[in-house]
Amino acid sequence: MPGRAPLHTVPGALGPWLLGCLWAWTLCGLCSLGAVGAPRPCQAPQQWEGRQVMYQQSSGRNSRALLSYDGLNQRVRVLDERKALIPCKRLFEYILLYKDGVMFQIEQATKQCSKMTLTEPWDPLDIPQNSTFEDQYSIGGPQEQIMVQEWSDRKSARSYETWIGIYTVKDCYPVQETFTKNYSVILSTRFFDIQLGIKDPSVFTPPSTCQIAQLEKMSEDCSW
């Protein structure tokens, strides 16, 4: 166009300034593309039922249970499963009502009930928005693969993590959560057979025996 100088011949400081602006815009564009392509934490389902296998370092045991999870009302119900005959093994049902700050422990055979105060705050089963993306990979063999993403609480100032969560790419179902301390696994839970929704909301209602509940936690073995 008449009267418009080529960029490389703009007199004075205006030329370098325009070049700097173009360079900055180019960098911003590249950053935007990177941000769009970067994985972001998905939103896990708020209400679902399934099964879990939990390993606790303190006991050295794996425990199996049915799980009802209600994130909307901050409550969880865990029902111990018997998968093998273990001498002197008592099976319990646990109802955790975080809004009320209480947990009920009910022995399945006798309905004996203990009522205890929840000391830990509600911690939803999902991926925190400030989590660090670690990896994406498939579980299973050919024709049976499920894509999952691995997230952690690792930060740049710390080279190790204390929490790792694995969730499916599709629908954001929980697959596994692992907690570590001093490089050792202290708690690891695997989730499977997940179905959306709560089939029977009454599972969160303690039985009538809990009206006269004791205040001490019952032992899992026969030494009561």
UniProtKB/Swiss-Prot annotation:
Listed Pfam families: Ependymin (PF00811)
Assigned keywords, A-Z: Disulfide bond, Glycoprotein, Lipid-binding, Lysosome, Secreted, Signal
A GO cellular component annotation in the UniProt record: lysosomal lumen
InterPro entries recorded: Ependymin (IPR001299), Ependymin_CS (IPR018224)
Glycan-bearing residues: N130, N182
Main location: other
An annotated GO BP: cell-matrix adhesion
Keyword Transmembrane: no
A GO MF term: lipid binding
Post-translational modification: N-glycosylated; the glycan contains mannose-6-phosphate moieties.
Function as written in the Swiss-Prot or TrEMBL entry: Binds anionic lipids and gangliosides at acidic pH.
PANTHER family named among the record's database cross-references: MAMMALIAN EPENDYMIN-RELATED PROTEIN 1 (PTHR10697:SF1)
Protein name listed in UniProt: Mammalian ependymin-related protein 1
Organism: Macaca fascicularis (Crab-eating macaque)
High-level lineage: Eukaryota, Metazoa, Chordata, Craniata, Vertebrata
This protein's encoding gene: EPDR1
